[in-house]
């Protein structure tokens, strides 16, 4: 499981997010896999679209959430998790 340490999260606003929040890109196969899982399990989640084409994943804001600059990212009540397979295991 890839859960970021609190000290790794530089975009502090996400530490206050409540519920299941997914940062994703519509064309990312890993994001698509996670969205399918969430819908199959009927898990309610809030969408935060990250435009990879425009390079949003390399913005200071996004890198402050995930220093690897990849999607999807799960923020669950302020805890940040990355890597789609690990996120699915965590939520299942």
Q: Predicted regions: what is each one?
A:
Residues 1-92:
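GST-like domain detector, emphasizing the conserved glutathione-binding G-site
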């Amino acid at each position: 499981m890839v859960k970021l340490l609190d000290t790794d999260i530089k975009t502090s606003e996400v530490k206050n997010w409540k519920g299941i929040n997914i940062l994703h890109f519509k064309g990312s196969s890993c994001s698509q896999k996670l969205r399918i899982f969430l819908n199959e399990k009927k898990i309610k989640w809030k969408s935060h679209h990250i435009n990879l084409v425009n390079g949003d994943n390399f913005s200071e804001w996004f890198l402050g959430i995930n220093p690897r600059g990849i999607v999807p990212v799960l923020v669950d009540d302020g805890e940040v998790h990355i890597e789609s397979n690990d996120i699915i295991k965590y939520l299942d």
